[in-house]
């Protein structure tokens, strides 16, 4: 690679926690607002929802003068084309990321992984990333699965000197007024006791819970 490229996986062992939406939001913000060169590798097969989303966007723009004008205005403001979104498998994600980073001279590659550890190559890909972002929701079953897998991965990474993975970073997502505050508070405390990295993503309506966070905030 002509410059160091950060590889970041978006992963959770349960679906429905907002992985794909988060991937698009992060990539778009860093690409268009922070002027970083980014790309997304969609490994969430077989649906590949992000690849399909990009194809739908292209068709919509081609068929709509209004959307064409929006794209032109965005280009005038940012002078940046749309970032690449390519499909791959979890097993081949690292290889695809390296090739893409070399070709596009990227700063960050986001890898959207399947929502199950049973998919071939997920564990291998995770430990070969620089960082893993893990959106979490206050659901007992989701959190049990999430923490079990994450601690296993981190223990493995610490025991292997040649593993690139530096950290798994958690944050709460999809919090609503009817969310289970007991689960939220309990698992926030557990993650603090385990010294896991947790971003402060708590809405104002939950600040009375005084949830523990890491020094990353």
Q: Where are the language model's segments positioned?
A:
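Walker A (P-loop) phosphate-binding motif
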Residues: 2-30
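A general structural motif
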Residues: 5, 35, 106, 165-167
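P-loop/Walker-type NTP enzyme "switch/lid" segment
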Residues: 11-17, 32-110, 115-116
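Short, well-ordered alpha-helices that flank and scaffold nucleotide-derived cofactor binding pockets
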Residues: 24, 28-32, 55, 127, ...
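Alpha-helix C-cap/termination motif
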Residues: 33, 103, 128, 193-194, ...
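Conserved catalytic-core segment of NTP-binding enzymes
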Residues: 114-201
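Conserved small/polar residues in nucleotide/adenosyl-binding loops
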Residues: 207-213
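Acidic, Ala/Val/Gly-enriched low-complexity intrinsically disordered segments
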Residues: 215-217
């Amino acid at each position: 690679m002509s410059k160091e490229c950060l590889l970041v996986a978006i992963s959770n062992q349960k679906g429905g926690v907002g992985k794909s939406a988060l991937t698009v939001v992060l990539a778009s913000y860093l690409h268009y607002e922070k002027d970083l060169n980014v790309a997304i590798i969609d490994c969430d097969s077989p649906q590949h929802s992000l690849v399909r989303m990009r194809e739908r966007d292209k068709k919509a723009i081609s068929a709509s003068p209004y959307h064409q004008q929006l794209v032109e205005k965005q280009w005038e403001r940012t002078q940046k084309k749309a970032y690449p979104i390519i499909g791959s498998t979890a097993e081949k994600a690292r290889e695809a990321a390296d090739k893409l980073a070399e070709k596009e001279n990227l700063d960050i590659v986001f890898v959207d992984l399947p929502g199950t550890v049973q998919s071939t190559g997920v564990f291998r890909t995770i430990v070969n990333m620089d960082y893993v972002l893990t959106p979490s929701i206050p659901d007992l079953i989701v959190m049990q699965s999430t923490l079990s897998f994450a601690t296993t991965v981190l223990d493995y990474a610490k025991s292997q000197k040649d593993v690139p993975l530096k950290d798994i970073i958690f944050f709460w997502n999809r919090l609503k007024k009817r969310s289970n505050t007991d689960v939220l508070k309990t698992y926030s405390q557990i993650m603090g006791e385990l010294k896991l990295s947790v971003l402060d993503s708590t809405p104002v309506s939950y600040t009375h819970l005084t949830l523990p966070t890491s020094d990353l905030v």
